[in-house]
UniProtKB/Swiss-Prot annotation:
Protein name in UniProt: Hydroxymethylpyrimidine/phosphomethylpyrimidine kinase
Gene Ontology annotations for the cellular component aspect, listed alphabetically: cytosol
Enzyme Commission numbers on file: 2.7.1.49, 2.7.4.7
Swiss-Prot/TrEMBL catalytic activity: 4-amino-5-hydroxymethyl-2-methylpyrimidine + ATP = 4-amino-2-methyl-5-(phosphooxymethyl)pyrimidine + ADP + H(+); 4-amino-2-methyl-5-(phosphooxymethyl)pyrimidine + ATP = 4-amino-2-methyl-5-(diphosphooxymethyl)pyrimidine + ADP
Family: Belongs to the ThiD family.
Alphabetized InterPro entries for the sequence: HMP/HMP-P_kinase_dom (IPR004399), PM/HMP-P_kinase-1 (IPR013749), Ribokinase-like (IPR029056)
GO molecular function: ATP binding; hydroxymethylpyrimidine kinase activity; phosphomethylpyrimidine kinase activity
DNA-binding listed as a keyword: no
Amino-acid positions noted as binding 4-amino-5-hydroxymethyl-2-methylpyrimidine in the UniProt annotation, renumbered to this chain: Q46
Annotated metabolic or biological route of this protein: Cofactor biosynthesis; thiamine diphosphate biosynthesis; 4-amino-2-methyl-5-diphosphomethylpyrimidine from 5-amino-1-(5-phospho-D-ribosyl)imidazole: step 2/3; Cofactor biosynthesis; thiamine diphosphate biosynthesis; 4-amino-2-methyl-5-diphosphomethylpyrimidine from 5-amino-1-(5-phospho-D-ribosyl)imidazole: step 3/3
Species of origin: Helicobacter pylori (strain ATCC 700392 / 26695) (Campylobacter pylori)
Entry keywords, A to Z: ATP-binding, Kinase, Nucleotide-binding, Thiamine biosynthesis, Transferase
Gene expressing this chain: thiD
Entry's Gene Ontology BP terms: thiamine biosynthetic process; thiamine diphosphate biosynthetic process
Enzyme class label: transferase
Length: 270
């Protein structure tokens, strides 16, 4: 009997170092046992020490990739990551209107590790107008929350305030990730989960490692894979966070900078 694997999609950038973007997404999909497809929005020259170049693809090539997936695959859920510029965002939004790819998880890659904005203002406006209202789940980190809402999240109250602004922008559900910030250096880090029918906090003990490149990409990809396998949103988020915590606690020693994640560490658990 031929086993049927759920089919999923990532629309994101390519990371030559293999730690984030499309490469991280496909590794997460494979680990979960779902079949991953991809639409590449940009090529990046990067490694564990940094990003050395970003080269957006043409809107024609992005559209062609989406249509190729639409015409041949039964996508159960999909994610979007780095979308580079307003032209690509508009292209993706327009083309997705002709597709039925299931639930969408948007990981809004907007801010570099050094705090620099990766999207220009025009692109941020397009993201807010065209993609936020149609996204099933948004997974921003704190700098991305600030870029979208103007709210500095430091505690439960400010997280709720930020979610209020996101809801005004059309966001239905969000995971506000609290791990990547100087404001939270305690024993635990919080992720604030705001769903249409529930609100809760996921906390995990901090693990002292620099090898966390691609955590945001991997979390959103794990959620997509688990949704495609039939989990509801609440359980998919909780399970993905649990798996990501195990991954971070079992780091790889690859490269000379911020190394990639160890997806092998959860192979026996999924």
């Amino acid at each position: 009997m031929v086993k049927i694997y759920p089919q999923v999609l990532s629309i994101a950038g390519s990371d030559s170092g293999g730690g984030s973007g499309i490469q991280a997404d496909l590794k997460a999909f494979q680990t979960l046992g779902v079949f991953g497809t991809s639409v590449i929005t940009c090529i990046t020259a990067q490694n564990t020490q940094g990003v050395h170049g970003v080269y957006p693809l043409s809107v024609e090539s992005v559209k062609a990739q989406i249509l190729a997936i639409r015409d041949d695959f039964s996508i159960k859920a999909f994610k979007m990551g780095a979308l580079c510029n307003a032209q690509i965002i508009e292209c993706v939004a327009d083309t997705l209107e002709t597709c039925d790819f299931g639930l969408c998880v948007l990981d809004p890659v907007m801010v570099a590790k050094n705090g620099a904005l990766l999207l220009e203002e025009e692109a941020i406006l397009s993201l807010k107008k065209r993609l936020l209202p149609t996204t099933h789940l948004l997974t921003p980190n704190l700098p991305e929350v600030y870029a979208l809402t103007g709210v500095q999240v430091r505690d439960d109250k400010s997280a709720s305030k930020a979610m209020g602004v996101l809801r005004d922008l059309g966001v239905k559900n969000a995971v506000i990730k609290g791990g990547h910030t100087e404001h939270f250096q305690g024993e635990y880090s919080n992720d604030w989960v705001f769903l249409e029918d529930a609100e809760f906090i996921l906390n995990a003990k901090r693990f002292n490692t620099k090898n966390t490149h691609g955590t945001g990409c991997t979390l959103s990809s794990l959620i997509v894979g688990l949704l495609a396998q039939g989990l509801d949103l609440k359980n998919a988020i909780s399970k993905a966070k649990e798996l990501l915590t195990i991954i971070i606690q079992n780091p790889l020693n690859i490269g000379h900078g911020h190394g990639p994640l160890n997806l092998w560490s959860i192979k026996e658990l999924v």
